Amino acid sequence: MRILLTFFFLLSSFLSVAQSRLTIVELNTENLFDTRHDTLKNDYEFLPDSPRHWTRTKYWQKLNRIGQTIIACGEDSSGWTLPDIVGLCEVENDSVLFDLTRRSLLRKARYEYVMTASNDARGIDVALLYSPFSFRLIKADTIRVIPMKEMRPTRDILHVEGEIESGDTLHVFLLHAPSRMGGEVYSRPFRMHVMERLCSAIDSLRSAYTDPKLLVMGDFNDYADSPSLQLAYEYGLINISAGVHGRNGAKGTYRYHGEWGSLDQILVSVNLRSWVTDCRINDALFLLEEDTKYGGVKPRRNYNGMRFNNGFSDHLPLVLRLQY
């Protein structure tokens, strides 16, 4: 009886520890498009008869590779578990998310999802996968980003409110800021515009809630010291991902002309800082390939120019672990 009681005590202690952890992933998927044309969207680049020859076979390979990437993000020194929350950028539509969560390698994970329906010209959006067993959805809403002068329609910001197992409410914001097309200086006001919209939403949230717990993540198309991120810091957000590396040579989430940089970021409010136990780039070896031009390694992307590379993404995922 004593042995049995000891076993149950240890088991309950293990479950208590396991339930008090949260794994969060951010990933730009690099053009996760299906093979069908969406009316009024410029998705012609990813159709079967396009120069990329984006076929059903390539599409399903891509879905399973994204699933493989997400699954790999659940591994750490204490074992493996599926991520609880996954923020995805560059996702085309609901059909893609249905296939990813119900028919790909992730089908047994039982993820639920929410996403934006933006006016982005290419039709790409952001989406949040979540495990209903560790994150109970309260509500999700879209923060509209109305283009300023000379700015093309871009992705809206996704705000998701959910309850975690401790009973705390977590507010998650997911964004994909405008690219640096036209140059960093020219495009900087567009990213500042998105950040100002985010900060305004955070202001409203803080007026409605007492000391809300905030997590902001996504592809900011800016670095940790960029003006748009500086604005976020002024609003009391802490960049947990600044300066993090991978274990296999990655010094950023993205590599351009041989230089590593992190366009992807994860920020938290001050009241979440003590919960953070780890933040890193997942540069598992299967996500990398040799950089034959500049040396070292680089993300094994799906396309090199127009050449199909049968890879994963041009971005590496960020992995954040919280313990509460």
Where are the language model's segments positioned?
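Bacterial Sec-dependent N-terminal signal peptides
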Residues: 1-21
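N-terminal, active-site-proximal structural segment of metallo-dependent hydrolase catalytic domains
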Residues: 18-103, 114-126, 195-196, 290-303, ...
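Metal-dependent phosphoester-hydrolase catalytic domains
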Residues: 23, 200-214, 221-324
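Structural recognition of the beta-strand scaffold that forms the well-ordered cores
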Residues: 23-26, 84-89, 112-115, 127-130, ...
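Structured beta-strand-rich core segments of catalytic domains in phosphoester-bond hydrolases
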Residues: 29, 85, 91-177
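Sec/Tat-exported extracytoplasmic proteins
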Residues: 31-33, 70-78, 87-90, 101-104, ...
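Active-site His/acidic residue clusters
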Residues: 40-43, 173-187
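Active-site environment of divalent metal-dependent phosphoester hydrolases
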Residues: 93-95, 121-123, 180-182, 221-227, ...
